[in-house]
């Protein structure tokens, strides 16, 4: 059993939004962030003075599009040359360049310096935010977490997500697949209804990724039969279509192109995202953006039918993986008991209709919250792994599968599969190979994942060499190759020459794109440094606010007629002068250090407090002397101002 202080959390690290849950009081609590939202934008922004994560980052994106990073999940574990990365770069306002080993690196300006971050580092910042949200709620530090990934994530994407966890200072107990996590939420929701074995299809369409998994659930055993999907299809692709549509409309109406105006595009994208959501519940909506480009106001309407038409190819594409999982699981669609919707994009009526038509009019299951189901399942798995949960969850068993076939290259560039796709993990497969030529001193083991017959069409995961094979005719040496997948879906491969006893192995961690231990350690240190800087900024803001509050509250106090009568003219002028000087100083020194603000506060208190206490002693108001607390609580006419961001 884990000790009480070792509470583990479940994090749904999403493309556009993330969510965190924890098992407590015999159920899962989905934890709201400091803004009261139960999901947090997966956004990180860098400014001249600070780093922002979550809602704060997304709220200022229109003012700072080049330095606000999102969609790190669409980059993680991919190469810069990947066609999907190249097409995404066209839509992103931030700059992505090719780093060492073709790793995509995100370039931003932070504190007036150019900085490069890997997708793992950006994701780790979002994970730190989710960790802090949980810590604020639980009132203690959190070390352990279960983090989810799309079921269709390949080996390098899983490994990179695990690295992001390490950089954030979390101990990632397990990486689990999002649809499987959602199935746990569904299974617990339906726990009372004991109806033997059920075939359940999880349809998970989020902001940037799409998964379909088919499971059988029986008495707390969740067995994934097949999984399919697209790690590059989601709500953002529907937003992109809307943005392109309105850019063309603006060009047509006003003969001007906004494609080069990053701020205008961002404001348009925000409006498109809002319009898309509105169209899930109404048949038509309008987009109104003041002064979008060169002072021109933009006003347009969009109907649900038009939105559906411009995305119909993508919507139809969502049905292909559904057919694929049924085929792989050798099931007819009539034997699916429940179709469960997960992910915000499943709220789109057309997608629901296509899915319902596919299943011959079957009612879809909407009983679980599509935004929170994945974090819910991850929190349950975290409780199981730390021995936290009650009997209700401790007897759950998850049997997941490898999403892609794994094998190695044999003579002639042929893909020889050792572990076929949809094999239950963890698993281990061994096969004996031999040499291709006489007296061959070594063999090159090249490990691939994918479904094609030729290795050149599949994804190379890694290579290693087995040397020191004694001279022998071709086909004589016995080389035993072992593929071993752990519970996170990460692969270890070893090869051994049985006769000579030579052995070599590799953990497939995509040598080219993978971060080394040293790099991860350096990133951990960087993360701590950034966190310390964030703390410093927070302290500065607090110190500045205390000073401002005190000054404005003092001003209000001496404006109160009842109290002002008790002050001599000289004292009143003395306080007014001190307050005016302080406010002027604040306006000219917004970026001053904490101790400067604190010094100014002491200085101002030194002038005001003696006068105020003298005033109260001279037969003051019945309440006695107000403390600093009373001053700072009244909010003041001035105080820190907030500004609406479009």
Swiss-Prot record:
Signal peptide: none annotated. InterPro entries: ATPase_NBD, Heat_shock_70_CS, HSP70_C_sf, HSP70_peptide-bd_sf, Hsp_70_fam. Gene3D superfamilies: 1.20.1270.10, 3.30.30.30, 3.30.420.40, Actin, Chain A, domain 4, Substrate Binding Domain Of DNAk, Chain A, domain 1. The keyword Metal-binding does not apply. GO terms for molecular function: ATP binding; ATP-dependent protein folding chaperone. Keywords: ATP-binding, Chaperone, Cytoplasm, Nucleotide-binding, Stress response. It is found in: Cytoplasm. This is Heat shock 70 kDa protein 5. It comes from Arabidopsis thaliana.
């Amino acid at each position: 059993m884990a000790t009480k202080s070792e509470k583990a959390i479940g994090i749904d690290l999403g493309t556009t939004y993330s969510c965190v849950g924890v098992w407590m009081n015999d159920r899962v609590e989905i934890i709201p962030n400091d803004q009261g939202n139960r999901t947090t934008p997966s956004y990180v922004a860098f400014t001249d003075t600070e780093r922002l994560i979550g809602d704060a980052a997304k709220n200022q994106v229109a003012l700072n599009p080049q330095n606000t990073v999102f969609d790190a999940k669409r980059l993680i574990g991919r190469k810069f040359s990947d066609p999907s990365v190249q097409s995404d770069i066209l839509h992103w306002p931030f700059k992505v360049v090719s780093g060492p080993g073709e790793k995509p690196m995100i370039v931003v300006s932070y504190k007036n310096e150019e900085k490069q971050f890997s997708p793992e580092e950006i994701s780790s910042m979002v994970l730190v935010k989710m960790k802090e949200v949980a810590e604020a709620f639980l009132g203690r530090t959190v070390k352990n977490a279960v983090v989810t990934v799309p079921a269709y994530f390949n080996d390098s994407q899983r490994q990179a997500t695990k690295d992001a966890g390490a950089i954030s200072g979390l101990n990632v107990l397990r990486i689990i697949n999002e649809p499987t996590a959602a199935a746990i939420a569904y299974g617990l929701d339906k726990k009372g209804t004991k109806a033997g074995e059920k075939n359940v299809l999880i349809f998970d369409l989020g902001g940037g990724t799409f998964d379909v998994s088919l499971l059988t659930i029986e008495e707390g055993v969740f067995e994934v039969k097949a999984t399919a999907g697209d790690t590059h299809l989601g709500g953002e692709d529907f937003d992109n279509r809307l943005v392109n549509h309105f850019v063309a409309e603006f060009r047509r109406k006003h003969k001007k192109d906004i494609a080069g105006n990053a701020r205008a595009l961002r404001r348009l994208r925000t409006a498109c995202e809002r319009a898309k959501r509105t169209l899930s519940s109404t048949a038509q909506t309008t987009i109104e953006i003041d002064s979008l480009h060169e002072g021109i106001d933009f006003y347009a309407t969009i109907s649900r039918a038009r939105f559906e038409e411009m995305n119909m190819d993508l919507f139809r594409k969502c049905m292909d993986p559904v057919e694929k999982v049924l085929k792989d699981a050798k099931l007819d669609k009539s034997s699916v008991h429940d179709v469960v919707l997960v992910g915000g994009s499943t709220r789109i009526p057309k997608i629901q209709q296509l899915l319902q038509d596919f299943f011959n009019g079957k009612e879809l299951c909407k009983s679980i919250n599509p935004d929170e189901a994945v974090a819910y399942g991850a929190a349950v798995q975290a409780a199981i792994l730390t021995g936290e949960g009650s009997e209700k969850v401790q007897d759950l068993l998850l049997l997941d599968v490898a999403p892609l076939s794994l094998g190695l290259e044999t003579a002639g560039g042929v893909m020889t599969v050792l572990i076929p796709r949809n094999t239950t993990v963890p698993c281990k497969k061994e096969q004996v190979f031999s040499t291709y030529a006489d007296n061959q001193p070594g063999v090159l083991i090249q490990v691939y994942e994918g479904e094609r017959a030729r290795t050149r069409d599949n994804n190379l995961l890694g290579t290693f060499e087995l040397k020191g094979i004694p001279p022998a005719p071709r086909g004589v040496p016995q080389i035993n190759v072992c593929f071993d997948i752990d519970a996170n879906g990460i692969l270890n491969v070893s090869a051994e020459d049985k006769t000579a006893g030579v052995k070599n192995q590799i953990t497939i961690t995509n040598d080219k794109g993978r971060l080394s231990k040293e790099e991860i350690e350096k990133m951990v240190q960087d993360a701590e440094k950034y966190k310390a800087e964030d703390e410093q900024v927070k302290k500065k803001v607090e110190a500045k606010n205390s000073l401002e509050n005190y000054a404005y509250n003092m001003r209000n106090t001496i404006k109160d007629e009842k109290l002002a009568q008790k002050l001599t003219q000289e004292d009143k002028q003395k306080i007014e002068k001190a307050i005016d000087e302080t406010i002027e100083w604040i306006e000219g020194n917004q970026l001053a250090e904490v101790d400067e603000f604190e010094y100014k506060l002491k200085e101002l208190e030194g002038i005001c407090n003696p006068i105020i206490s003298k005033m109260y002693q001279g037969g003051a108001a019945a309440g006695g002397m107000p403390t600093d607390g009373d001053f700072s609580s009244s909010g003041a006419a001035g105080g820190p101002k907030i500004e609406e961001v479009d």
